[in-house]
Amino acid sequence: MAETDAAAAQQPPQIQMRVLGQFIRDMSFENVMAQRGASGDVQPDVNVQVNLDAKKRSTDNQYEIAIKLNITSKAKGMDDVLFVFEIDYCGIFHVEGVPNEQLHPFLLIECPRMLFPFLRRIVSDITRDGGYPPLNLDNIDFMALYRSELARQQAAAQAEQKADA
């Protein structure tokens, strides 16, 4: 009996994650080409910028995760903007069993990974409804994005320390 209690105490806690809700916090689709009265077949050159944010909510073990996309589409080879699409898509998650030192990466990697398919569909539908071919976003490597942001923050902190010295 004591052996089973000791074995249970040594096992890491079971990670539990539930999506409690997801929603569009803010969205803007500016159809610049249509406002100018222009039409026709143009090859788009699409630029997608991704930002992530995580906030603890007042309820225990609940977090709000936001994926913020800023998408600009220009006519290929020109500076003419076709459309600008900004969306702030959020999910409310209940997370348990994640050690504190792993919580931040978990929230900014695993939670956005769960939300992304829904966000991709919204982007596709809105661009199609805006009169363009549906924009089917490629998968985002949230782990690489997290590591890149962490490296950028560390480099900025080092540069700040050198400037203060």
From Swiss-Prot:
InterPro entries to which the protein is assigned, alphabetical: SecB, SecB-like_sf
One of the record's GO molecular function terms: unfolded protein binding
Top-rank lineage group of the source organism: Bacteria
GO annotation terms (biological process): protein folding; protein tetramerization; protein transport
A cellular-component GO term for this protein: cytoplasm
Keywords on record: Chaperone, Cytoplasm, Protein transport, Translocation, Transport
Classification via Pfam families: SecB
Primary location class: cytoplasm
Location in the cell: Cytoplasm
UniProt similarity note: Belongs to the SecB family.
NCBIfam families on file: PRK05751.1-3, secB
Subunit annotation: Homotetramer, a dimer of dimers. One homotetramer interacts with 1 SecA dimer.
Summary of the function given for this chain in its UniProt record: One of the proteins required for the normal export of preproteins out of the cell cytoplasm. It is a molecular chaperone that binds to a subset of precursor proteins, maintaining them in a translocation-competent state. It also specifically binds to its receptor SecA.
Protein name: Protein-export protein SecB
Species of provenance: Ruegeria pomeroyi (strain ATCC 700808 / DSM 15171 / DSS-3)
Gene that this sequence comes from: secB
